Each structure stands twice: as C-alpha cells, then as structure tokens.
Amino acid sequence: RMLYGFEVSVILIVLRQILEDFDSNPTESQASYKYVTATEIKEEAELFLPTTFNRAKFEKDLDRYIDSIVSFGFLVEAKHAEGEKRYKIHRIIKEKVTLDDLLEFKNKLNDYDAADESL
C-alpha cells in the first residue's frame, strides 16, 4: 500500500469526486472517459489546500503534485487543449479512492468547518 502526501491525497480525492460526478451525470454518460485540464484540477484542489503567500511557488507545487499523480497512473496525459495540458482520469482511481474515502473526507471537512465556526 503506497502512502501519499497530504496534497497529493487531496488532489486524488478531488479527481475521484470529479469522476463520480461525471459517472452520475446522465448527459455525460455517452462519453466513457473524463478529461480535465490542469487548470480545472488546480481550481478544485485550491479549495482544500492552504495557499501560500508566494502564488508562483504554489502553482509550481500543484504542477509537481499533478505530475506525481500522472506517474502513479491515476492521470494519463492527453493532447493539449489550446496550449494547456489535458488529462484523462484513469478509472483505477476508483479502486484506490473509494466512495467511503470520499464520504470520510467530506465528514472531516464538515467537522473542521464546525470547529472553525465555534472559535
């Protein structure tokens, strides 16, 4: 069992949620693969990752985390779309990040929000 860092784990959860939304959307069910751009991944991941004062470093770190996920086989680089990297979310991510993992992550976020509001 491979251990991932916090940031990579968060991005894996985000990708799994994107794939779950794709699979449960009847209008997109004719497509068999979900493609995302690097920008889409970053925008979703930023909601859960602490940003630093150095925006350029944060962007570079996100690129590095995405590259790691590609090397693990959860993302497959596809053709570039309008000069931007595009990735296919590999369905093996469903085996690594289960629906239970998604639920646990959401519950932890809710607990964190509740604790934050009580301060």
Provide a role label for each language-model segment.
Residues 1-34:
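Short basic alpha-helical hairpin corresponding to helix-turn-helix/winged-helix-like nucleic-acid-binding
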Residues 66, 70-81:
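A short, conserved structural fragment
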Residues 25-33, 52-57, 77-78:
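Short acidic, glycine/proline-enriched loop segments that cap or flank alpha-helices
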Residues 82-90:
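Minor-groove-contacting beta-hairpin "wing" of winged helix-turn-helix DNA-binding domains
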